[in-house]
């Protein structure tokens, strides 16, 4: 864990569609008034999927997006370190339909609180060392699958067949190999998804305590 108290970094990990984004956005919205709109931000690990613009679409769709090698954690670490030092960064934008980064970026200025959310955040010791608190969303995989099918079909233009095939071939095996074991690094394990009110209140209280430290 980082000793720098000027920027509190909270990492939220867990399976795809386990409620990470929901709990991150809830905490963000409920803490904005306390810390200030411009002093809290959310970074999604998905933004740091590797740039695959040099590959054909046929090659891009074969990428195992649930393996740590699919992510540019070097750049994510670099950006977090810059934010902690008080420097602004340009967060990449990733296209789920094109399976690569776009030319757009989102500027982010230094914050008092940064909430990270992503499936593989706790697998990287460099990222863990930058975090002041770590969270694992312990949602049953069958629930995650139902949510993922709905999300990917409705929001990302996927077919149900492709979502189920990906789940069987990479999502579930990679969860067992990488994501589930990373639960051991969580300070807080959250059951029942992103609407767990007690867990949200505990996290908010812990962040407030860290800000006062």
Swiss-Prot record:
It is found in: Cytoplasm. GO terms for molecular function: ATP binding; cytidine kinase activity; uridine kinase activity. It holds the Pfam family PRK. It is an enzyme of class 2 (transferase). ATP binds at residues 14-21. Gene3D superfamilies: P-loop containing nucleotide triphosphate hydrolases. Keywords: ATP-binding, Cytoplasm, Kinase, Nucleotide-binding, Transferase. The keyword Kinase applies. One of its GO terms (biological process) is CTP salvage. Its EC number is 2.7.1.48. Its main location: cytoplasm. GO terms for cellular component: cytoplasm. Pathway: Pyrimidine metabolism; CTP biosynthesis via salvage pathway; CTP from cytidine: step 1/3; Pyrimidine metabolism; UMP biosynthesis via salvage pathway; UMP from uridine: step 1/1. InterPro entries: P-loop_NTPase (IPR027417), PRK/URK (IPR006083), Uridine_kinase (IPR026008), Uridine_kinase-like (IPR000764). It catalyses: uridine + ATP = UMP + ADP + H(+); cytidine + ATP = CMP + ADP + H(+). The keyword Manganese does not apply. Belongs to the uridine kinase family. This is Uridine kinase.
């Amino acid at each position: 864990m980082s000793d720098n108290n000027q920027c509190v970094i909270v990492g939220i990990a867990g399976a795809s569609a386990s409620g990470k984004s929901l709990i991150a956005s809830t905490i963000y919205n409920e803490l904005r008034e306390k810390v200030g709109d411009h002093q809290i931000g959310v970074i999604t690990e998905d933004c740091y999927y590797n740039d695959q613009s040099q590959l054909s679409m046929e090659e891009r769709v074969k990428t195992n997006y649930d393996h740590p090698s699919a992510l540019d954690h070097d750049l994510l670490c670099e950006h977090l370190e810059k934010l902690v030092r008080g420097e602004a960064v340009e967060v990449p934008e990733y296209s789920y339909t094109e399976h690569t980064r776009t030319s757009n970026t989102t500027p982010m200025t230094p914050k008092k609180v940064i909430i990270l959310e992503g499936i593989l955040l706790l697998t990287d010791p460099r990222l863990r060392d930058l975090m002041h608190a770590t969270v694992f969303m312990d949602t049953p995989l069958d629930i995650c699958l139902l949510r993922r099918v709905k999300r990917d079909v409705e929001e990302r233009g996927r077919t149900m067949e492709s979502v189920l095939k990906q789940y069987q071939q990479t999502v579930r095996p990679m969860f067992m190999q990488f994501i589930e074991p990373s639960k051991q690094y969580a300070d807080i394990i959250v059951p029942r998804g992103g609407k767990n009110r007690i867990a949200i209140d505990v996290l908010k209280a812990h962040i407030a305590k860290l800000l006062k430290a």
